């Protein structure tokens, strides 16, 4: 019993000593106030303060400044939003990366090409070296000078009427085609049925199209691509159709035409509002003529004055000259791409967009028995010289890069902005 009492007394003394030590700590920390009544009151803080570990101290110190007044919190939120919206250096750089647009002329898939394609694949249409260029561009555009279809009857009293089975749309995808213009003088050779089949075939293959549609709104519609931080817009129209009835209407299928420039000019002005670069592809001119008609020059200038950044032409089936107007390039005719069974020289036009500059490079080609390949290096100087003779005020260097050099020639200005070949 005595032993038990000693144990209780010792325990009580230990608790009193522990309580005294705790009060001393509270006084030192300022957690205990001594009111005038002389009674000691211990105020417990609403939030218990725990000293961080050394490894956590720096992180908590950094966060402390962010947990301030409501105004400071609002400012922090705004700063955080700004930081999220502001592009990183990597994003800014990617927005300035060059964009390569590649353009070819008239495309038709002859019976001979179709036969070879079934046996050899896409090598029947283009050489390996050319294919790498076609597929390597950010975007490839051609004039599709035929409808895909199996229905309809050929137009009476028309010398040449074209139609290709929709299954051969794979030729275009194999070539790397991204967009075609359908505004030309062969799209309704077999009536409006094949036009509907054409739109379906291209849509199914993921190939964009301009210049024709199920109604006028579709035919004149702008098609855009987002490439390298730029919005690139495309419009297509024809100045060559066999009959007025080929025109699209409010409720009828057909083509978008530009005999009167007003409608296309209006579309260009609308495109300028949302596009960084606008291309107008026009079917015009006289077949087999290497010189543009005066109306081609007039229309091209109207398009550029309205906001077009480049004008591409087709229909003559031969090359016509190049011109700069207000610093913007005009290719009056890119001739044939892959079109006939014969042998002929032609070219692709490569536009490189870098900032506000347009670098232009010509890629000479030769087509033989429907297969297109790069022109031999030894033949290129004569090719460039021939094209220069069709292009007053234009210089073409040994690599096919184009620049304007003669002040005042054909609307060309000295030191034309944008007429700077890519390095």
Annotated model-derived regions:
Residues 1-12:
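N-terminal Lys/Arg-rich, disordered targeting/topogenic segments
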Residues 11, 15-59, 68-71, 77-79, ...:
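Acidic, metal/ion-coordinating pockets
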């Amino acid at each position: 019993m005595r032993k038990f009492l000693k144990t209780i007394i010792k325990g009580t003394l230990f608790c009193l000593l522990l309580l005294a030590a705790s009060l001393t700590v509270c006084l030192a920390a300022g957690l205990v106030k001594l009111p005038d009544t002389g009674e000691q009151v211990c105020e417990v803080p609403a939030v218990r303060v725990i000293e961080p570990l050394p490894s956590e101290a720096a992180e908590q110190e950094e966060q402390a400044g962010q947990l301030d007044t409501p105004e400071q919190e609002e400012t922090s939120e705004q700063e955080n939003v700004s930081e999220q919206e502001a592009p990183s250096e990597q994003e800014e750089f990617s927005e300035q990366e060059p964009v390569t647009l590649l353009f070819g002329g008239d495309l038709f898939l002859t019976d001979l090409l179709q036969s070879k394609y079934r046996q050899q694949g896409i090598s029947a249409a283009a050489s390996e070296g050319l294919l790498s260029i076609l597929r390597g561009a950010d975007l490839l555009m051609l004039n599709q000078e035929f409808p895909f279809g199996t229905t309809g009857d050929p137009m009476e009293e028309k010398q040449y009427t074209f139609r290709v089975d929709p299954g051969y749309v794979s030729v275009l995808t194999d070539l790397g085609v991204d967009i075609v213009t359908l505004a030309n003088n062969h799209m309704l050779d077999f009536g409006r049925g094949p036009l509907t089949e054409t739109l379906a075939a291209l849509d199914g293959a993921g190939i964009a199209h301009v210049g024709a549609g199920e109604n006028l709104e579709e035919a004149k519609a702008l098609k855009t691509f987002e490439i390298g931080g730029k919005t690139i817009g495309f419009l297509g129209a024809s100045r060559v159709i066999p009959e007025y009835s080929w025109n699209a209407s409010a409720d009828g299928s057909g083509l978008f035409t530009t005999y009167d420039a007003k409608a296309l000019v209006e579309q260009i002005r609308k495109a300028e509002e949302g596009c960084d670069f606008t291309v107008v592809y026009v079917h015009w001119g006289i077949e087999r003529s290497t010189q543009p008609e005066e109306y081609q020059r007039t229309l091209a200038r109207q398009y550029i004055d309205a906001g077009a950044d480049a004008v591409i032409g087709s229909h003559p089936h031969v090359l016509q000259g190049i011109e700069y107007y207000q610093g913007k390039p005009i290719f009056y005719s890119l001739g044939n791409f892959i079109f006939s069974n014969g042998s002929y020289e032609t070219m692709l036009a490569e536009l490189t967009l870098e900032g506000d500059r347009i670098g232009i490079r010509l890629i000479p080609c030769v087509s033989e028995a429907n297969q297109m390949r790069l022109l031999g290096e030894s033949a290129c100087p004569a090719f460039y010289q021939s094209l220069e003779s069709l292009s007053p005020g234009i210089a073409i260097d040994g690599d096919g890069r184009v620049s304007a050099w003669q002040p005042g020639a054909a609307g060309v200005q000295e030191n034309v902005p944008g007429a700077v070949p890519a390095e």
